[in-house]
Amino acid sequence: MKVYSIGRETGCDIVINDSTDVISRRHAILNVTSMGKMTIVDQSHNGTYVNGIRIAPNVPVPVTRKDSVSFAHVARLDWNRVPKSGEAIKYAS
């Protein structure tokens, strides 16, 4: 399984540039199995949303590339930018 950290901290795998500090340093985790199944886990104070519904903190929620995933309603996950080979990327909302 690959685990991708998402947040405003520069050490995250997917970095969200957020000058308002609404995005947490480590906002969420995206887990991807070797079979391509994915879950997202909210680790923030301001929430992670899947298809407009706030998910419970620290509970893995199944997602697909067709789902809309947003962070504190200020940034959306661009599925085309999810790392495919484990490299860190920069993601600007």
Show which residues each predicted segment covers:
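Short coil-to-beta-strand transition motifs
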Residues: 21-25
